[in-house]
Amino acid sequence: MIKSRFAPSPTGYLHIGGARTAFFAWIWAKKQHGKFVLRIENTDLERSTQASVDAILQGIDWLGLNYDEGPLYQTDRFDRYKQIIQQLLDEKKAYYCECSKKRLQILREELTKQGKKAKYDGCCRNKNLHTGVVRFNNPKEGIVVFNDVVKGKISINNQELDDLIIARSDNTPTYNLTVVVDDHDMKINIIIRGDDHINNTPKQINLYQALGWHLPEFAHLPMILGNDGIRLSKRHGAVSIMAYRDAGFLPEALLNYLSRLGWSYGNQEIFSINKIVQLFELKNINKASASFNQDKLLWFNQETIKSSSVKNLLSNLTWHLQNQEIIIKDTPNIEIVVRYLQDRCKTLVNMAGELKMFYQDFDTFDEKLAKKFFKDKTPLKRLFVELEMLNTWKADNIKQVVKQVCFELNIGFGRVGQPFRLALSGDGNAGSIDIVAELVGKNKALLRLKMAIDF
């Protein structure tokens, strides 16, 4: 059975790169009818925070990446790590090192001057010490070879590898040790992660082999860059995943876009999550870096809003309505309003903002627009009279009244439509005025027209 995992370190929020890694690992487990594990790698006690843990869990939950096991915490497994470290020490596959930071710094500088790779020289390897950090006794000969599912065959000479530290002087284990022990104990057989981890893989493979454990498969995902070709950072949009929720993005739109950062299926761009699971193949992930484009993500969001069910939109709108303190009343029917708005809104923030005009009264108008469109009140006054006499308050009838007023006053549509739009919305941000007027309702529409006339 396939078993994948997402194993973030809680030293910050869940960002775009981490979300894509989690999604690909989740997809692969679902596609293979396997299991997806969430593990929190929090052994770095100085940098790990509960706030970061909460942010990661919130992001995973919002994205809908349900996990079969977890969240599992490395801090609950210290006894197991100590057991493995002691085993390696007993088998002479690890040793204590008391080299000072100063000595190591001098060593690095000397090797760098000589044009050599800066790595530990094994000074304490045969001293039989009993205190200090613990280093893994990396093989001195041979080549580490592995077939990465994405990158292909990768090999590195053991002479290039360091005797990595697997336990700090305070006895806490380090990343490369804990990740190997966890993946083995949790029966993870496919490790999907960013290619910034690829240099760790040969070291971890040597640890697997020293412990006599079966190797998992590795799949290293290409880096995500900004449009300028530089590694993604905050200025490109590498913000917390929850910032995208706050900005009005649908989780499935974000996931759809993230899937396209490295994976493709012909020329098709919009997929349901189920379709991505069906079509996705790790071997089809591009080796080259992917570029993050905020405008493209916005397009994905707009298209997803258009095709989403009203039920799904309402579910995701709830947070935004609460955030903007919008209280939904019985009329007009919220489902009808959302169905109208979904073809014109790029984000849920836009949609929530436009919902206001249907449910919240206002007592003023955009001053700049009012000076422009309320200068001549004749069209509004005429429109008020005709609409007040209208017996059947439907969009088609309202449209005919607007056309009639334009004809009677011998003016273009804009001379009537723009003032009417501003009167209905307060800020001029409304779509088809006939549909908006119908949804707002006759009484409220007439009250707003009267307020515009008196403004």
From Swiss-Prot:
GO cellular component: cytosol
GO molecular function: ATP binding; glutamate-tRNA ligase activity; tRNA binding; zinc ion binding
Compartment annotation: Cytoplasm
Residues spanning the membrane: none
Segments carrying motif 'KMSKS' region: 231-235
Residues that bind ATP: 234
Catalytic activities: tRNA(Glu) + L-glutamate + ATP = L-glutamyl-tRNA(Glu) + AMP + diphosphate
SS bond list: none
Record-listed E.C. numbers: 6.1.1.17
CDD domains: GluRS_core (cd00808)
Keywords, in A-Z order: Aminoacyl-tRNA synthetase, ATP-binding, Cytoplasm, Ligase, Nucleotide-binding, Protein biosynthesis
Major subcellular location class: cytoplasm
Gene3D superfamilies referenced in this protein's UniProt entry, alphabetically: 1.10.10.350, HUPs
Keyword Cell membrane tagged: no
InterPro entries named in the record: aa-tRNA-synth_I_cd-bd, aa-tRNA-synth_I_codon-bd_sub2, aa-tRNA-synth_I_CS, aa_tRNA-synth_I_cd-bd_sf, Glu-tRNA-ligase_bac/mito, Glu/Gln-tRNA-synth, Glu/Gln-tRNA-synth_Ib_cat-dom, GluQ/Sye
Motif 'HIGH' region, residue numbers: 8-18
Family: Belongs to the class-I aminoacyl-tRNA synthetase family. Glutamate--tRNA ligase type 1 subfamily.
Function: Catalyzes the attachment of glutamate to tRNA(Glu) in a two-step reaction: glutamate is first activated by ATP to form Glu-AMP and then transferred to the acceptor end of tRNA(Glu).
Quaternary data: Monomer.
Record's protein name: Glutamate--tRNA ligase
Source organism of the structure: Vesicomyosocius okutanii subsp. Calyptogena okutanii (strain HA)
Lineage: Bacteria, Pseudomonadati, Pseudomonadota, Gammaproteobacteria, Candidatus Pseudothioglobaceae
Gene name of this polypeptide: gltX
